[in-house]
């Protein structure tokens, strides 16, 4: 059985839940010698503690700091791209390789079908995303979700294939950044990401980008140019991680909380700044507490966005996408 990961700010809740489990176990193990009044009292105590646990849970997750949301975005049990693909789509056909160098396992992609049974909506899509591992072995295989140049070139190849067959593109972003190794730099990481930005802006099919966990720097935006930019409630998206920002500004990682506040990297921050278009609500406690519900919510929103984008003609899609990204940010011009 996997060990439950408890974040620092979750410890008071974890302790109360452990106490509640003990009381429930005590009730299950109670013998017939226990009087009805004692059983009733224990039931009452359990109900009281359940209310306290629920209130504490809602209080904690309603008032998360930016750094705490970064921690939730990195939770090892959080659903990854493959989890969402399996929960949201059917008939997934993975496609491999960049046709230049190799197949980067940190980015996966392929054709799939997303459906809505209530309305009969059924749409083939190209779905592409970063993929992390669940343990040391799989993380080494996936390079901890840090894509190399061939990963971004593979992603672009799949997007252009989708364009050829007139299928919309969905990207799922979850990376601590592009791989910073010397070999990756020699193979052209910067060029690969820049080429993706240029080509994604011109794709003549709908493109929806979703930050499902970490969205760090060029590694994230390398598959992040779209008609709609969505963010999971407890994800983050920034030019730099809080730890790296702290090490640059204060020469130490211990100021990561202050860095997270200064970076304004949460979904709420970015929605208010016009960087993203929509926040995807998560179950209380984070996406990992109920992946099925999280995937169902994301699927519903994706279908809604697809229905809005599919009727648009290619020229309109490209024009609006370029205008969208051109209008981001604030700057001053000299008179």
Curated annotation (Swiss-Prot):
Query: What does UniProt give as GO cellular component?
Result: acetyl-CoA carboxylase complex
Q: Which domain of life is it from?
A: Bacteria
Keyword flag Transferase: yes
Task: Give the classification, highest ranks.
Answer: Bacteria, Pseudomonadati, Chlorobiota, Chlorobiia, Chlorobiales
State the encoding gene: accA
- Quote the subcellular location field of this record: Cytoplasm
Q: Which Gene3D superfamilies match?
A: 2-enoyl-CoA Hydratase, Chain A, domain 1
Q: How does it assemble?
A: Acetyl-CoA carboxylase is a heterohexamer composed of biotin carboxyl carrier protein (AccB), biotin carboxylase (AccC) and two subunits each of ACCase subunit alpha (AccA) and ACCase subunit beta (AccD).
Q: In which pathway does it act?
A: Lipid metabolism; malonyl-CoA biosynthesis; malonyl-CoA from acetyl-CoA: step 1/1
Q: What is its EC number?
A: 2.1.3.15
Q: Which UniProt keywords apply?
A: ATP-binding, Cytoplasm, Fatty acid biosynthesis, Fatty acid metabolism, Lipid biosynthesis, Lipid metabolism, Nucleotide-binding, Transferase
Domain CoA carboxyltransferase C-terminal: from-to ranges: 48-308
Name this polypeptide is given: Acetyl-coenzyme A carboxylase carboxyl transferase subunit alpha
